[in-house]
Amino acid sequence: MHIESPIKRRQSTRIYVGNVPIGDGAPIAVQSMTNTRTTDVDATVAQIKSLEKVGADIVRVSVPTMDAAEAFKVIKQQVSVPLVADIHFDYRIALQVAEYGVDCLRINPGNIGNEQRIRSVVDCARDKNIPIRIGVNGGSLEKDIQAKYKEPTAEALLESAMRHVDILDRLNFDQFKVSVKASDVFLAVDSYRLLAKQIAQPLHLGITEAGGARAGSVKSAVGLGMLLSEGIGDTLRISLAADPVEEIKVGFDILKSLRIRSRGINFIACPTCSRQEFDVIATVNELEQRLEDLITPMDVSLIGCVVNGPGEAEVSHMGIAGSNRKSAFYEDGVRQKERFDNDNIVDQLEAKIRAKAATLSKENQIDINQID
């Protein structure tokens, strides 16, 4: 029912984004980014709350102007999830949002001005205990690095990242995490592998500009799956041209599939064939929607016939093995006397799952921030 992940995670230092621990064995944090106009406070707050509802640990907000910084102040007062301010070029914006309680600054020290300006931001972050995320992207490398390498390479992304890391090192600031994102899976993976050998700080994973919901999810799962399976990564974002809520769902699904961090129901369902005795596809789709609010980790198997049904059910918290008119029901791997009417499986199983989740939650005192 619960198989421990065989993955041994890379040892890293620990930082905190608000109250969320990052690195040094902490649960891998799942985050997203708002796509509203930050100056539209109501829309931005609503989106942040929708992200928090589906489990977002951290939310990033773009703050491109001083007007956006003023809006950020109001937004921060209305939400509880830790917020990262995404800032480029203007160091004054970083100083301003620091005064407004930002939980993390996403800046690249090398692009916010001269040494004095960089030092002022870093000193402010140190004084207020605000971590920094260095964010390198294959599509926006420094001009001299572009000229040197001609095209984005793993070595180019690493050089860019280390340039910013060296700045923070010179200023004796070690409360930071780093990302080296690229839209190409192999480029991103190779870049993170190189970086993981160079620094001890936490790594923020992502395949940038991955695409739409379907293709982007697949690309992210492949790239991040490779890295996570090697123990690389302390926090992640799935970058989709889609509703940011989907980014959180996909992020947790990737972690769940690797048994790294589980949230909610893990459905094991057959692709169906002519042997199915109940409508598996409709059942899975309906239950996924109805049970989105559950955070308790559970394995639920929905198999349409008795070929694989009993075997899957025996290693699940709950399971259905399809049979004629009434299907067999399993709980904790044991077949129950009760059988489910094939025409009413969804309602019956939802009630059973909710009751089981409540029991497990009470027994284990489930705190989603500690599920790892």
From Swiss-Prot:
Pathway: Isoprenoid biosynthesis; isopentenyl diphosphate biosynthesis via DXP pathway; isopentenyl diphosphate from 1-deoxy-D-xylulose 5-phosphate: step 5/6. Its EC number is 1.17.7.3. This is 4-hydroxy-3-methylbut-2-en-1-yl diphosphate synthase (flavodoxin). Converts 2C-methyl-D-erythritol 2,4-cyclodiphosphate (ME-2,4cPP) into 1-hydroxy-2-methyl-2-(E)-butenyl 4-diphosphate. It catalyses: (2E)-4-hydroxy-3-methylbut-2-enyl diphosphate + oxidized [flavodoxin] + H2O + 2 H(+) = 2-C-methyl-D-erythritol 2,4-cyclic diphosphate + reduced [flavodoxin]. HAMAP family: IspG. Binds 1 [4Fe-4S] cluster. [4Fe-4S] cluster binds at C270, C273, C305, E312. InterPro entries: Dihydropteroate_synth-like_sf, IspG_bac, IspG_bac-typ, NO2/SO3_Rdtase_4Fe4S_sf. One of its GO terms (molecular function) is 4-hydroxy-3-methylbut-2-enyl-diphosphate synthase activity (flavodoxin). It comes from Aliivibrio fischeri (strain ATCC 700601 / ES114). PANTHER family: 4-HYDROXY-3-METHYLBUT-2-EN-1-YL DIPHOSPHATE SYNTHASE, 4-HYDROXY-3-METHYLBUT-2-EN-1-YL DIPHOSPHATE SYNTHASE (FERREDOXIN), CHLOROPLASTIC. Belongs to the IspG family. One of its GO terms (biological process) is terpenoid biosynthetic process. Gene3D superfamilies: Dihydropteroate synthase-like (3.20.20.20), Sulfite Reductase Hemoprotein, domain 1 (3.30.413.10).
